Structure formats: structure tokens, C-alpha cells
Design a protein with these regions (language model features):
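Receiver (REC) domain active-site loop signature in two-component systems and cognate sites
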Residues: 55
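Conserved acidic carboxylate
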Residues: 8
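Acidic, metal-coordinating helix/loop segments flanking the phosphotransfer/catalytic sites
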Residues: 30-48
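As written
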Residues: 60, 69, 94-100
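Two-component/phosphorelay signaling modules centered on CheY-like receiver
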Residues: 11-29
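Active-site residues of response regulator receiver
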Residues: 52, 82
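Acidic catalytic/metal-coordinating carboxylates
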Residues: 33-36, 59-65
Length: 122
């Protein structure tokens, strides 16, 4: 079963994403902050990570940078999901190695699921 990791500090959003991805047939693990995201990613080895940027302890940008530098996670597919919509933020995410960057206010849950499916195939 394909494993997706949801990294989101907002418990309501985390629950919504978790419920939807489980309904789509994915094995789902989650983390509520950047620090937990790093340890969970190495331990659980997800096929894809949905990564928030503005989080407690360690920002999503720093998490992304560390994941790409860690042998166990350097090739994991990562989609950034953030409220940050400035082009500089999008470029930073992509330059740090995100496979895609989605702005939360600009995508529906169905579009997020489709982007995950598309990214997993690539």
C-alpha cells in the first residue's frame, strides 16, 4: 500500500487530509510539527510527503532542506502545501527540492489528491 505522510500543524486540516487519503486507499501517517516530521519520515519511509511550511519548531523549508540531505529521504516525493503564495516562496520550495508547490487557498481537496497521484506516477 502506498504510504502518504501529512505534515500539518492545524489539527483540523490534518484530520481532513488524513480522512480523505485513507478513503482513497492510502496508508497515512502524520506529523504536527517540523521536528516530528523529520523523525517520522525516516522511521515510516513514506512514498510521498505533503508538507506545510509555517509550523512550530522547524519550518517546512528547513524540513524540506534536511529531508533532501538525508540519505533515507532524499528521493521521497514531497509536495509543499502552504498558505504562502508569493513567487519567492514558491521558488524557494522548488529550489529546495519540492516536487510540487500548492497554495492551500488555491486548490481543492480533490485537486490535492490528483496532484498526489500525478506526483507518485512521475
Amino acid at each position: 500500500m502506498t504510504k502518504v505522510m501529512i505534515v500539518e500543524d492545524d489539527p483540523t486540516l490534518r484530520d481532513i487530509y488524513t480522512t480523505r487519503f485513507m478513503a482513497e486507499g492510502y496508508d497515512v501517517v502524520s506529523a504536527s510539527d517540523g521536528e516530528l516530521a523529520l523523525t517520522t519520515a525516516v522511521k515510516e519511509k513514506p512514498d510521498l510527503i505533503l508538507l506545510d511550511i509555517m509550523m512550530p519548531k522547524i519550518s517546512g523549508f528547513d524540513v524540506l532542506d534536511i529531508l533532501r540531505a538525508t540519505p533515507e529521504t532524499k528521493d521521497t516525493k514531497i509536495i509543499v502545501m502552504s498558505a504562502l503564495s508569493q513567487s519567492a516562496d514558491v521558488e524557494r520550495g522548488k529550489s529546495l527540492g519540492a516536487n510540487a508547490y500548492l497554495v492551500k487557498s488555491q486548490v481543492t481537496l480533490t485537486e490535492v489528491v490528483e496532484k498526489v497521484k500525478e506526483t507518485l506516477k512521475s
